[in-house]
Amino acid sequence: MGARGSVLSGKKTDELEKVRLRPGGKKKYMLKHVVWAVNELDRFGLAESLLESKEGCQKILKVLAPLVPTGSENLKSLFNIVCVIFCLHAEEKVKDTEEAKKIAQRHLAADTEKMPATNKPTAPPSGGNYPVQQLAGNYVHLPLSPRTLNAWVKLVEEKKFGAEVVPGFQALSEGCTPYDINQMLNCVGEHQAAMQIIREIINEEAADWDQQHPSPGPMPAGQLRDPRGSDIAGTTSTVEEQIQWMYRAQNPVPVGNIYRRWIQLGLQKCVRMYNPTNILDIKQGPKEPFQSYVDRFYKSLRAEQTDPAVKNWMTQTLLIQNANPDCKLVLKGLGMNPTLEEMLTACQGIGGPGQKARLMAEALKEALTPAPIPFAAVQQKAGKRGTVTCWNCGKQGHTARQCRAPRRQGCWKCGKTGHIMSKCPERQAGFLRVRTLGKEASQLPHDPSASGSDTICTPDEPSRGHDTSGGDTICAPCRSSSGDAEKLHADGETTEREPRETLQGGDRGFAAPQFSLWRRPVVKACIEGQSVEVLLDTGVDDSIVAGIELGSNYTPKIVGGIGGFINTKEYKDVEIEVVGKRVRATIMTGDTPINIFGRNILNTLGMTLNFPVAKVEPVKVELKPGKDGPKIRQWPLSREKILALKEICEKMEKEGQLEEAPPTNPYNTPTFAIKKKDKNKWRMLIDFRELNKVTQDFTEVNWVFPTRQVAEKRRITVIDVGDAYFSIPLDPNFRQYTAFTLPSVNNAEPGKRYIYKVLPQGWKGSQSICQYSMRKVLDPFRKANSDVIIIQYMDDILIASDRSDLEHDRVVSQLKELLNDMGFSTPEEKFQKDPPFKWMGYELWPKKWKLQKIQLPEKEVWTVNAIQKLVGVLNWAAQLFPGIKTRHICKLIRGKMTLTEEVQWTELAEAELQENKIILEQEQEGSYYKERVPLEATVQKNLANQWTYKIHQGNKVLKVGKYAKVKNTHTNGVRLLAHVVQKIGKEALVIWGEIPVFHLPVERETWDQWWTDYWQVTWIPEWDFVSTPPLIRLAYNLVKDPLEGRETYYTDGSCNRTSKEGKAGYVTDRGKDKVKVLEQTTNQQAELEAFALALTDSEPQVNIIVDSQYVMGIIAAQPTETESPIVAKIIEEMIKKEAVYVGWVPAHKGLGGNQEVDHLVSQGIRQVLFLEKIEPAQEEHEKYHGNVKELVHKFGIPQLVAKQIVNSCDKCQQKGEAIHGQVNADLGTWQMDCTHLEGKIIIVAVHVASGFIEAEVIPQETGRQTALFLLKLASRWPITHLHTDNGANFTSPSVKMVAWWVGIEQTFGVPYNPQSQGVVEAMNHHLKNQIDRLRDQAVSIETVVLMATHCMNFKRRGGIGDMTPAERLVNMITTEQEIQFFQAKNLKFQNFQVYYREGRDQLWKGPGELLWKGEGAVIIKVGTEIKVVPRRKAKIIRHYGGGKGLDCSADMEDTRQAREMAQSD
């Protein structure tokens, strides 16, 4: 380690490892801390050898000490470890870092007092970090060390001209001459923008210097002149002159310090540019800790770098002025000019107490005012409660305790046997419950009353005269959330006067009171005989009350309370009586708006906070038929993870989310734990992959992202549903399959087994069930408030309405109450009542919306993954920021690249990114949709073939977007415009349900001409055409018929694949010809060159015949933009022509000029290819009308020729060649439908996976005829699943009977819905087209249907495997049989491992996976390699273990033991 290892000797190293990092902490210093400190010294230009002595450490501390108050955490850590090393060198005994800092600072203060005062700066002693030093009475310049320059470069590169750069420059340039400073600037010269800013500041300051210090005139010979501005900047002065100006005896001019000040001004301007946050904008958030606010404040303050007096003023005024109201109140109480340490200490306990104050004030308000009418309260009975009803016999007039009838068996709540009332599933879960004493506690049923109030009750209270009629209503000694204060006090006094009875009911043990948290639990308590009302608050440590006197035996104490600190009196061992129990605890008295009992009293009372479980009905869940639950062993876990899982499981069990699995449960799923993002807490994960495989399928969860372009509403509120999964119960019959085992450390005891009672995370059904449950909960509320917009996405709910503030708040309150009543929690900290609302990446206001702040990443090295994320952010921003472009950035990651592959930026991509950054810096706002206002869409074309559009209502922009999908190298502007219109139409239909009026940059005539002949899209919305000034037009005029009397050019090109040499040329019908020799070309390029040659040499009107389908395809598309130079030349020439006819003729067989030109360009290049099978292929197509791939497969002709044959057929050229593709479904899945043609009924069945069809004409569309057809189909082909629409014939009993007898699962969809039975609907269309082609070959419709079915099954090739549907179906059946056979053969080789030896090596290797066992050898798989090993060199063992985790160190041990056993064998 060099000098790093010599910093401390062996003895001092031992002493270092005894010093603690923090007072009272467990962690101690290690040698790695010294190594880290050595590396950090380079940043400050300090030699690592300084750490080897006490004096050296003292020099380091002098440099670092002034920077510590405003420095970063790394700087403070470096200062701390240097203090510890200093104390070790000084032989000072220290226990921890704080002691070392005190001793080091004491030594620094003593040395400062000993230093003599000087009036002018002098050069430092030898060995300092200064370039000018005094040797023998003369000043000598030493160049800056590479370490100093390296530290400066590192500082700039790492901080990116952040606030730390300015103080870093001050420290590193101390004592430097202008020459040295220029050397530092040259080291970071690649930052051109920053350097230009600094140069401008230098020029301005130099001009000001020259104006303020005019030249005195000619100087005597030999006398040193006064420095000019350029001299200070080091451009017209030497190093010697700079030293003389700095250190001359009379009138020294500190040119170095002056130049440093200029550079600092420039750096400050750079910092402000790179870090635009102003010190005035640094304000503390309502819940932001004061320390975090101070860190941000000082970071921005360092960027200011103003005069120390100004900085001091900012600290004393702005720091306090911009704090939140709670901290500001505390800070003002500290008096004038408090120190930073005092401010941090005073605000340490405040983390947004304003919120706490509002909550407590709300609690007090709710306790003293009537509750609002809850949702659907009209369905609940009003009035007082009825008479007492016995739970045992059901009669009125007495309670169950007084009942003389025999005790009824089973639950008193629901009447069912098998459980008691305390465990009744219909009982509402209690939140706050006293722990049971003695036997199991009997818990009474508990639900909110009709008025929304909550009550407290014990079983013996009905005997005191309380009314408990209504079954679920529970009386209370005091009403906690409704009624007036007088009734609260009256009820409390009555309860106190009644004699206290023992809460014991027969043999059922102690019955504890329950407190629901639908409202805040306010109860009456007696403190040393003084009656008070208190709020039970489990979020507070201490208890504090007001308005009582407990004597003079107290301890003064200051606690963080509402609005700041509260002076209180703390009394210990005070007698408190609450809810029938007497305890002695510590309590404080002081000025508090509401009395609180905190955890110190609640724990003494035995109260716990219990999690609610939703009262929604569990969804029935089953395993797949014939499947069983997972039985996978738990893999070993580390001690740390076991303890973490134990704590998590115990907490979940207390909250009712888990329960202990019975010993008869045979199922198990592995569990493990990972660290959360903060690295302090653990998260439990269950590997539900096996359970997911055997669980039934669920509706696919389609969390469609809701847009924020909702209709404009007056008020908006956002609420969050917390822990939704854990609030919904799991089907009790399915819970057994979720069992998992928590192992014990060292297997000291059997693992504890649990099962889930709620929806577990990671299980496939949780999302679907949660979605379904939330919809059922919200549906009644939506119907009751039809004028309110409720958007739910995951656990975020947005409520928007035009109601008044009071009515809107009431709706929100009712929705929250409804969710709480159903068991869903709505955390207050995520409740957003006032704008702006943070929702789904947006900031919402009632009248406008914006995107949340978008920050583009800054990276040194860009990878493919980083580029993908950058494009995603830009695409997200494009919905509001017009002009966002990503074309050149996307080009950076074209091709097959790995995610971690490094990407080099091009100039165009960098320019595009910088342009996007400028766009994102501008403020953009969106508007909401207004009904009955016309919706408009304006399309614009930008450079580089990128399109932008905005959807607006008048001048209110609802949405903007971009389109840049250019799939072809050569494309047409009108075609792209059609795709843009298609995209806008789909978006508008989905979001607003209507098509906008389009403003398009094209003339209607141009559009109509292109659309008639060259349509290329599947769907275009209807619109009212409003053309803007045209930017798009058809570039040239292609005619459909040959031009009479004009010259005809026959073009051709050829290329030798080996030499890449080629020729291009043409021959005309008038005897002209021309050939051009090409090098390094291709056949396609040669064909294009020949076409361009003909265009160049021809008249304004010309006929051109080509034999290249490639050229014909490009010209027919009428491209206007291209990336190919030769195509660009063709476009340029075509624009000049008045009219051009382009024809295509396949091959060159006997076609006059085409054959001649082919012979002309083929000499020495290629052999002529005669396609003799064209005519048979054409005859085959005229007979069967097969598709392109069938012709290619059967006749071996090129695909271009086959495609032209199909396109030339007038019966097949209705809508071009279809794009073939098949949906690969299960082997036994068919779709069936009925269609009509010529008054006949045709029943069609399609095999989904292969496209094979069965079709015939049936006399009637009845269930009987359909059942007969289905039976005929099932007798020919394997069918297990039939999907149809819900027509009467398909839902008839006859069809269902056949399906049951054959064993077919039948599902239904919606008629004519493409998503329901899209395959058979499309096949009906193709079948009718095929019938139309063959109709003239048969008389009856029955015959032509069967002929068309034959052609579609045997004459239509394509899709998966390039097969016909008949070949594909037979292949699939055969493949399925082979798979089943091999699976049966290979099943016995599973779960076996093989250890083997190779060659003469006696060491056993493995284990490998057994693939096959033969008579003389075995085939094994080791990693990705397949090996054949003789039987005599292989040992086969059975593998009994389950899956293994990442930290199962036992696996390696087991493997090692197995190898040793195999070797000994």
UniProtKB/Swiss-Prot annotation:
Region Interaction with human PPIA/CYPA and NUP153: start-end pairs: 186-223
ZnF endpoints (Integrase-type): 1172-1213
Positions that bind Zn(2+): 1181, 1185, 1209, 1212
Short sequence motif Nuclear export signal: positions: 16-22
Region (Interaction with Gp41): 7-31
Start and end residues of each RNase H type-1 domain: 1043-1166
EC number: 3.4.23.47, 2.7.7.49, 2.7.7.7, 3.1.26.13
Domain of life: Viruses
Residue numbers with lipid attached (N-myristoyl glycine): 2
Keyword Hydrolase: yes
Catalyses which reaction(s): Endopeptidase for which the P1 residue is preferably hydrophobic; Endohydrolysis of RNA in RNA/DNA hybrids. Three different cleavage modes: 1. sequence-specific internal cleavage of RNA. Human immunodeficiency virus type 1 and Moloney murine leukemia virus enzymes prefer to cleave the RNA strand one nucleotide away from the RNA-DNA junction. 2. RNA 5'-end directed cleavage 13-19 nucleotides from the RNA end. 3. DNA 3'-end directed cleavage 15-20 nucleotides away from the primer terminus; 3'-end directed exonucleolytic cleavage of viral RNA-DNA hybrid; DNA(n) + a 2'-deoxyribonucleoside 5'-triphosphate = DNA(n+1) + diphosphate
Location of Phosphotyrosine modifications: 130
Comment on bound cofactor: Binds 2 magnesium ions for reverse transcriptase polymerase activity. Binds 2 magnesium ions for ribonuclease H (RNase H) activity. Substrate-binding is a precondition for magnesium binding.
Regulation: Protease: The viral protease is inhibited by many synthetic protease inhibitors (PIs), such as amprenavir, atazanavir, indinavir, loprinavir, nelfinavir, ritonavir and saquinavir. Use of protease inhibitors in tritherapy regimens permit more ambitious therapeutic strategies. Reverse transcriptase/ribonuclease H: RT can be inhibited either by nucleoside RT inhibitors (NRTIs) or by non nucleoside RT inhibitors (NNRTIs).
Site positions (Essential for RT p66/p51 heterodimerization): 1010, 1023
Bias (Basic and acidic residues): 105-114, 484-501
Region: RT 'primer grip', residue numbers: 837-845
PANTHER family xrefs: ENDOGENOUS RETROVIRUS GROUP K MEMBER POL PROTEIN (PTHR41694), RNA-DIRECTED DNA POLYMERASE-RELATED (PTHR41694:SF3)
Protein name as it appears in the record: Gag-Pol polyprotein
Organism whose genome encodes this protein: Human immunodeficiency virus type 2 subtype B (isolate D205)
